Amino acid sequence: MTLSAYLALALILFCIGLYGALTKRNTVIVLICIELMLNAVNINFVAFAKYGAHPSVHGHVFALFAIAVAAAEAAVGLAALIAFYRSRKTVQVDEANSLKH
C-alpha cells in the first residue's frame, strides 16, 4: 500500500468517528467513536513513520504510547459511565447535564 492509501483509510475512519461522536446520543457509542478517531490518528503516525522523508521508529513508538493513553482514557470514560448509569439509570448524552444538580 502507498502513503495515500493509508491516509485515505485514516481519513475515512476519522470521518466515521467524528460523525458518530457528533450525532449519536448513547455515551457508549460516543466513546467508541472517539476511540475510532484515535485509531485513525495512529494509522497516520505509523504511515508517516514508514513512508515519510526520514523513515524511523519514532512514529511507531508514538502510536504505541497513544494506544496506551487511549486505553487509560477508555477505562476512565467507562468508569464515569458506570457511575452515571448507577445514579441516573441512563447512558444518554442529553442527560449528562443533570450531573450538575
UniProtKB/Swiss-Prot annotation:
It is found in: Cell membrane. It catalyses: a quinone + NADH + 5 H(+)(in) = a quinol + NAD(+) + 4 H(+)(out). Keywords: Cell membrane, Membrane, NAD, Quinone, Translocase, Transmembrane, Transmembrane helix, Transport. GO terms for molecular function: NADH:ubiquinone reductase (non-electrogenic) activity; quinone binding. It comes from the Bacteria. Its EC number is 7.1.1.-. GO terms for biological process: ATP synthesis coupled electron transport. Pfam families: Oxidored_q2. The chain crosses the membrane at residues 2-22, 28-48, 62-82. GO terms for cellular component: NADH dehydrogenase complex; plasma membrane. The keyword Flavoprotein does not apply. The keyword Ribonucleoprotein does not apply. NDH-1 is composed of 14 different subunits. Subunits NuoA, H, J, K, L, M, N constitute the membrane sector of the complex. NDH-1 shuttles electrons from NADH, via FMN and iron-sulfur (Fe-S) centers, to quinones in the respiratory chain. The immediate electron acceptor for the enzyme in this species is believed to be a menaquinone. Couples the redox reaction to proton translocation (for every two electrons transferred, four hydrogen ions are translocated across the cytoplasmic membrane), and thus conserves the redox energy in a proton gradient. Belongs to the complex I subunit 4L family. This is NADH-quinone oxidoreductase subunit K. It comes from Geobacillus kaustophilus (strain HTA426).
